[in-house]
Amino acid sequence: MRLDNPLLVQWEYASEERLATRNATYRALVEGTNPEELAFRFVAERAPKDVLEVGCGTGELAERLGRELGATVKALDISHRMVELTRARGVDAVVGDVQQLPYADASFDVVVANWVLYHVPDLDRAVAELARVLRPQGRLVAATVGHDHMGELWTLLGDAATSGLSFDHDNGIELLSRQFARVDRHEANGTVSFPDRETLRTFVAATTTRSHLADAVPELREPLRTRSVVAEEPR
């Protein structure tokens, strides 16, 4: 099933548990450039007054942007649960769709869309909306993964192709360039080392489209090292 399937997205983000498991495992095990820190830096470079984060998840980044940059931050997510969690952090968050943003033209200095655009059915419409709400000379920060993200892991489990990515490391520049005159890609590559079968199985079980492979995880004779390929594409 594709990641831009609305029913899949609704199911995946009705609760935070699976997202929290993926994030906690990845953060604990990754070595190399931290894509979350890279995204924060791209926002901070602009010293923005007004920031919008779409696909805000549990609100960690939105809260940090307001706290550390002193920016006025608004957040949007299609999941009621994610908005609830973000509001609990003190962030002004609303339930909404990136394909039809509830904000006026030229409202924000920076818009953040991290690991969300591959969930959108109509990418062209979504990117046009992101461009619409940005002020002149504003910046969009959009993170996604590469087609070979954690390729060694999926090859081990017999599912080598990155499934369902409509917006990825390879086509991101072309898709964003339809609305933005300049798009720069920065890679945040690293290595994720899974120390044992149970850690790996827990991670796989929490993935969106490959959770059915969890029981196929074999015993590991040595830690499994797999590449993490993430692209940040600021305007």
Q: Where does each model-flagged region fall?
A:
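Class I SAM-dependent methyltransferase SAM/SAH-binding core
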Residues: 50-54, 58-100
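A short glycine-rich, Lys/Arg-flanked "PGG" loop and its adjoining helix->strand segment in the class I
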Residues: 124-136
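Nucleotide donor/acceptor-binding cores
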Residues: 48-50, 106
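A conserved beta-strand element that flanks and buttresses the S-adenosyl-L-methionine
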Residues: 112
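Short catalytic micro-motifs in class I SAM-dependent methyltransferases
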Residues: 115-116
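Conserved class I S-adenosyl-L-methionine
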Residues: 1-47, 60-61, 139-167
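Conserved Class I S-adenosyl-L-methionine
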Residues: 163, 167, 174-235
